[in-house]
Amino acid sequence: MKSILWHNLKLCAHGDPNDTIADAAIAVNGDGTIAWTGRASDVPAGYVHWPREDLRGAWVTPGLVDCHTHLVYGGQRADEFAQRLAGASYEEIAQRGGGIVSTVRATRDASEAALFEQACARLRPLLAEGVTAIEIKSGYGLELASERRMLRVARQLGERFPVSVYTTFLGAHALPPEYAGRADEYIDEVCERMLPALADEGLVDAVDVFCERIGFTLAQSERVFEAAARRGLPVKMHAEQLSNGGGSALAARYRALSADHLEYLDAAGVAAMRASGTTAVLLPGAYYFIRETKLPPIDLLRRHGVPIALATDHNPGTSPLTSLLLTMNMGCTVFKLTVQEALLGVTRHAAAALGASDRHGSLAPGRQADFAVWSVSTLAELAYWFGRPLCERVVKGGVTVFTRDAR
């Protein structure tokens, strides 16, 4: 591609709506990285005569980052939604053989091609909202061949679509039926067979575990983290969603990229996360969908300076959500985040939760030229509207990959 000077735009370069430039320009190198950003009046002489692209005064932010999703799976779980409306809890449904395990059955039965086609339909609406980087977890196969299929599909999505895909191995998501009553043996399988094989195939960017009463214990979770450490892989954790089990402190001890959910996080866990630099990933879609009543400790996270990210947590059972903008709205209305916190939560802090701050989440020299162009008059509208298309253009690596009128 050729170098381009994007001009006549309002710039929020670092995901902070309190740090903007009213008349800005972005110089993009031919390799798709940022060369320079700043005031239009300050464009360096070396970029002044580059070919130009006029954005007609639109707002520009970094491309959005969805840092926690379960996008690849078979089937759906609308029947469980009806059960939940009738009064069944998430734990009760899981104990009846529903929940994650029901999706495991559908995923194991699906071909790789079928998994890919279903995931495409879930990914497209996110891309149309300005998402340029996404995390995709495994965890609905729970045996080597099916976990491999899920991670292969995630890689294929990154090859087929203009989005950076970060894969996470979540073999320790639930106990598969064939291991009922033998959780430690299943963790042996995860640590000694599944993770080494998948890592050797280049399918794993990070490792996650569901540490909860209906998931895995602290001791079992630590075994998974140790296996990841032996492979030099970063870790993250589903922690404190349904109870305070101390998972966040364990995650912090292993310097996890993120601890996610966190409704039952306590002060000790917050302090540990702050000390380790672990990002708090909040998932308001799941909170809303399962009608949780315990809010994450937002004020504690603020006081300790723990970075807060937001993500869709797209999954079939507790958050069938394919809108990161609606996630921002929920973060503000349900979790009482500010617009500043919400936008940082889907840009800079979300990139940190992926260990990808050097590539995503901010428009600065050397980073990928991934940005979204918005048809709004103020950035608060990104968290204000829901159900309304706001993204008019997506640029990935300096190339326009989506325009609203091209859909």
UniProtKB/Swiss-Prot annotation:
Alphabetized UniProt keyword annotations: Cytoplasm, Histidine metabolism, Hydrolase, Iron, Metal-binding, Zinc
Main location per the UniProt record: cytoplasm
Coiled-coil region list: none
Binding site for Fe(3+): 68, 70, 238, 313
Localization per Swiss-Prot or TrEMBL: Cytoplasm
PANTHER family associated with the record: IMIDAZOLONEPROPIONASE (PTHR42752), IMIDAZOLONEPROPIONASE-RELATED (PTHR42752:SF1)
Record-stated family: Belongs to the metallo-dependent hydrolases superfamily. HutI family.
A GO biological-process term: L-histidine catabolic process to glutamate and formate
GO molecular function terms attached to this record: imidazolonepropionase activity; iron ion binding; zinc ion binding
Residues involved in Zn(2+) binding: 68, 70, 238, 313
Origin species: Burkholderia mallei (strain ATCC 23344)
Role, per record: Catalyzes the hydrolytic cleavage of the carbon-nitrogen bond in imidazolone-5-propanoate to yield N-formimidoyl-L-glutamate. It is the third step in the universal histidine degradation pathway.
Cofactor comment text: Binds 1 zinc or iron ion per subunit.
UniProt binding sites for 4-imidazolone-5-propanoate: 77, 140, 173, 241, 318
CDD domains: Imidazolone-5PH
EC class: hydrolase
Annotated EC: 3.5.2.7
Presence of keyword Iron: yes
Pfam families: Amidohydro_1
Cofactors (names): Zn(2+); Fe(3+)
Keyword Lipid metabolism: no
Catalysed conversion reaction: 4-imidazolone-5-propanoate + H2O = N-formimidoyl-L-glutamate
Protein name (database record): Imidazolonepropionase
Entry binding sites for N-formimidoyl-L-glutamate: 140, 315, 317
Gene behind the chain: hutI
